[in-house]
Amino acid sequence: MDKMKKPKINWLLIVIVGIIAALLITVLVLLFSPKTQPKSFDYLLKHFEEAAKSTTDDIYFETIKINSLDNTIGVIFRNGAMREEYFVAASAAQANFLTSGNVEVREILQLANVQAYIQSIKTLNGTISWFTFMNKFLAQHPGYDASKAGLFGQHIVQENGFITFIKAIWFPALIAIIIFLGYKAQSRAASGGIFNPGKNQAVIVKTDKKFTDIAGNKEPIEEVQELVDYLKNPKKYAAAGARFPKGILLGGPPGTGKTLLAKATAGEANVPFFFISASSFVELYVGLGAKRVREMFKEARKLAPAIIFIDELDAVGRSRGSGIGGGNDEREQTLNQILVEMDGINENAGILIMGATNRTDVLDPALLRPGRFDRIITVGLPDIKEREEILKLHSKGKRLSKEIKFDKIAKRTPGYSGAQLENVINEASLLSVREKTDVIISTQIDEAIDRVMAGPAKKSRVISQEELKAVAYHEAGHAVVGLKVKGGNKVQKITIIPRGNAGGYNLMTPEEEKYNASKKELLATIASYMGGRAAEMIIYGKENISTGASDDISRATKIARKMVTEWGMSALGPIKYEEDTENPFLGRDYSKGTFGSKMAHEIDLEIRKIISASEEIAIKAIEQNLELLELIKDSLLENETIVAEEIEYIEKNMKLPPNNEKIKPDGESKKVNIEDLINQVNESQEKDKQKNAQIKEDLSKMDKKDNLTKAKDKGEEETLAEKAE
């Protein structure tokens, strides 16, 4: 998002330019200033001697300045109409001699007259203080002009080194100070600063995102589009007597596009769009959050119609005075102020408040009522069709192989959010660069899916052949149960390459995506999770089962517990014993259930029954298909990774799929790729469907023929009966 108020200023660049400008000005001043010639210290003493010997006011020193920082002596010497300006690079002792003098000479001057002093020049040349001599000369010749007292127009001045340094740097320092003060003023204007901490933290943003940049989420987009249209054409809705909605809350899992939808709203609305994170309200000072809320709504009212978008609303919107930690006065004050501003005494005509959160369930009820957030829209995880659209959107501008089919990728990514799907495409792009391929190929897409789900493969991990074989049996067990138990999860991909903390990895998806599941389907799903453990028990015995089923058991137990405590699918009856409270620190009660220890024991028994029954289903399915188990295991040991099409080929033909290199009788090699294998399986399935349809049609014809025969026989019997009568 780009700030609309002010463009971003590169202060570092400005400071550098300012310093360069100051240095350039200093160089120019030095370049065009009058030039002074360097002279020796003896040359200066010679002029001192000439001035001392002169009996008129024509020879004198107009100025002598001694810089104690570098011991340079600046001199302006007058000899009649001639004016000579020069400087002397003196030593520290020479400069000190001119300003401090010689104790012996000063004593002579106190006792002798000027002539004696002049005589001393000849005998003590270079050892006297001419400054002291000037004072003595003026004291003995009061009639001389003070400005031209035979020697000096001014006293010798010893400049302070610090003052000299300040004179050299004052201009660059002034520029730097001005720039610094401007930067601090701009910072205070943006964030309130120490002198105005309660200043509005929301920024007016402008973005080029549109609703066309969002794939999936059609219902949320329609809801938001209506509000944007209201802001653009309020008269149309006013004529119908419609009230402008005050707020819209976007909820749902992380990564589903809530903030992206807000960006698109900003791009479409063409009205001031205030963006702020809820965590920006509460900071150091008491009452700061409430003040910032007031300032934000005050500015929004001035620019109405406008939209205020508060991201991560649960940071300040959680239920008041609840949870383990109790209430938080500062957060609750901020929430109270938001409630008042959204629906209080002050009117908010033309202001739409949008909020986004992952936890709508922990928000305060007063925040969710109509009149504040009139609409609560759930931006959920995309279904298979929406996943395909999202993948196509994020693939724009990327070079993809023609073999890649987005519908198959969507089928292999159930439960993925939009952010995860974008990450899949990005990971595949990075793999393409790493492997130096011109285009993104299907194997890179498969690897990207695995990386997003379970992390990168640990190919360097050393695993014994026996352990690898056990992992292959475990993963093959999942595949067999998925194929043979109706309603269970189907394995889309299996690998025995370690990922994360797991020795192997399998991707299981339901036969079709459904919003509701029957008890039979849930039991089949649990059975598919227990397929790995069942295979271990059959092959190695109950005493040699491994820890590889840890995650499977966890998932199976979670489903079984919900069947008992939430969905009423057990002998305990249709009673809800537990609430879904995974994190009590988000404003929930700590206790998950309202039942005693006896009921908890009964719940555990029912969960055990469900899992045990499902495990028996898995064991039975594998025992009846041991040959299929062995074939899938062999394929895994040979290839390390297999996909759903290869598993279906093995089930259909009860043999391993052809290798990538198949030798012809004449010795030439023929490549059989995975796409050909998939087509073979699909063609076989299509033929089976046609065959089954033909059988059904034949059976239907036979039934019709039998019915006609029966009707004919019945009619003849009725005719005979009539004749008999």
Curated annotation (Swiss-Prot):
CDD domains according to UniProt = RecA-like_FtsH (cd19501)
Top-level taxon of origin? Bacteria
What remark does the entry make about the cofactor? Binds 1 zinc ion per subunit.
Q: Which UniProt keywords apply?
A: ATP-binding, Cell membrane, Hydrolase, Membrane, Metal-binding, Metalloprotease, Nucleotide-binding, Protease, Transmembrane, Transmembrane helix, Zinc
Task: Quote the Pfam families the UniProt record gives.
Answer: AAA (PF00004), AAA_lid_3 (PF17862), Peptidase_M41 (PF01434)
What sections of the sequence does the record tag as coiled-coil? none
NCBIfam families assigned to the protein according to its UniProt record, in alphabetical order:
FtsH_fam
Name listed for the protein in its UniProt record = ATP-dependent zinc metalloprotease FtsH
Which species is this record about? Mycoplasmopsis pulmonis (strain UAB CTIP) (Mycoplasma pulmonis)
